[in-house]
Amino acid sequence: MNNHFKCIGIVGHPRHPTALTTHEMLYRWLCAQGYEVIVEQQIAHELQLKNVPTGTLAEIGQQADLAVVVGGDGNMLGAARTLARYNINVIGINRGNLGFLTDLDPDNALQQLSDVLEGRYISEKRFLLEAQVCQQDRQKRISTAINEVVLHPGKVAHMIEFEVYIDETFAFSQRSDGLIISTPTGSTAYSLSAGGPILTPSLDAITLVPMFPHTLSARPLVINSSSTIRLRFSHRRSDLEISCDSQIALPIQEGEDVLIRRCDYHLNLIHPKDYSYFNTLSTKLGWSKKLF
């Protein structure tokens, strides 16, 4: 056994028996290789593992060198928002539909993971967004996002009137169904479906993509990731929310603003040595093929 990674966490929320089988196979293989393994508590319960080290996501982040997330992109996003707070590397085995963030093929996962554990991997730092719903005399409500923060109506779809300030300078106003504020990681997710640009992961940029704007002149905007975005709203409005990675929703009350900025920490995402972002675009999203 090498010394690139000593303690490995197994993470995920299995929805299908095949995913649970992958968790069990991974656990037994890592133990046979001599690694210290920490299993997320829910997985250990599902597998009926006895007398094995278990932990929460936070405990895995504190104790392990590498977290292996088994599942789809949703599982990866949910785990990564917590794991990013810690100095831990993260890689994924795809057991979902698209698997844009989960690189390892479940049929060849052990061989690919073996190469990674021997130090043959590519490391990337992916920044997160922090979203705050705030008012002067109220406590802030805060969440984070790997992909995007989305402004949208709370229950029934309707048009929203709002203003956007960038670094406290008025940028534009809009009447639309909402706004997608995306990281480069999220530029191939919801933002892409709304007509936003694809940003390569290394770019220090944030995109603002309108959702069904009531004007022909509204276009996506790309700004520096060091900028702070403030959203202000008309007082005459129905319930609004912001959602983070389509997994966490924060309600917006009357008189409250939304502040969105880059997080102070980042996700350490690793890939197999032969990983290519543009190849992933081609295979996962049907990006155009080579002509010759």
Curated annotation (Swiss-Prot):
Its EC number is 2.7.1.23. It is found in: Cytoplasm. The keyword Secreted does not apply. The active site is at residue 73. NAD(+) binds at residues 73-74, 147-148, 158, 175, 177, 188-193, 247. This is NAD kinase. One of its GO terms (molecular function) is ATP binding. One of its GO terms (biological process) is NADP biosynthetic process. It catalyses: NAD(+) + ATP = ADP + NADP(+) + H(+). Its cofactor is a divalent metal cation. The gene is nadK. Keywords: ATP-binding, Cytoplasm, Kinase, NAD, NADP, Nucleotide-binding, Transferase. Belongs to the NAD kinase family. Involved in the regulation of the intracellular balance of NAD and NADP, and is a key enzyme in the biosynthesis of NADP. Catalyzes specifically the phosphorylation on 2'-hydroxyl of the adenosine moiety of NAD to yield NADP. InterPro entries: ATP-NAD_kinase_N, ATP-NAD_kinase_PpnK-typ_C, NAD/diacylglycerol_kinase_sf, NADK. GO terms for cellular component: cytoplasm. Pfam families: NAD_kinase, NAD_kinase_C. The keyword Nucleotide-binding applies.
